[in-house]
């Protein structure tokens, strides 16, 4: 504790702290067979109980892809294609979660081998469709992160995040909202960590109106959905969306009823 706070308050005064607890829970969850993930559902929700105690970096460093720990792609369960789908949904959850991000080189396109300082990355893998697809998807995630301040502006403030459904362990689906400072272009994230498609999936939303799908795991482009007045996930409205196996969805919307009112303070 007190690593990144103000020195006047007895803190060490660092800008950020690696969130090793989150890293451990995250990796323990994503490497499990999807059938057993429902028994470990709280591993991905627990981090929010202390997310504002420090200024955190969500870190997947070189130390997690060496010494027989496997690369990120190698950690994923399932057959060949399942591993890529698992990694996409894992990275989506990570990019939506409060905290700055650190991902070691080569993990964005699915390096198979562990990292070694004695050789270069396996760039030739980008010539294979699955690796190129993973790289393109991660690039799209980075584009969203850079374009929409909701992803980062209120990282250190509770006003910047709220769960839609943190308790859907039986289906291993997580949904949450990242809020902007002015209530514009808030982002709704949905992550399905199982190989089970949910064609009639409904996610609760805080208000009526349009919800624009700006990214999903199929990479089919934007689509606008209209919320219906049906209570879902303890929210007054809902959006129906055909959630694929290992599916992800990121929607943008504005002026939600619980928009952030507290401005982020400048770090001194």
Language-model-derived ranges and their functions:
Residues 1-77, 81-84, 88-89, 96:
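Glycan-recognition surfaces
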Residues 37-39, 63, 68-69, 78-103, ...:
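Carbohydrate-interacting/catalytic domains
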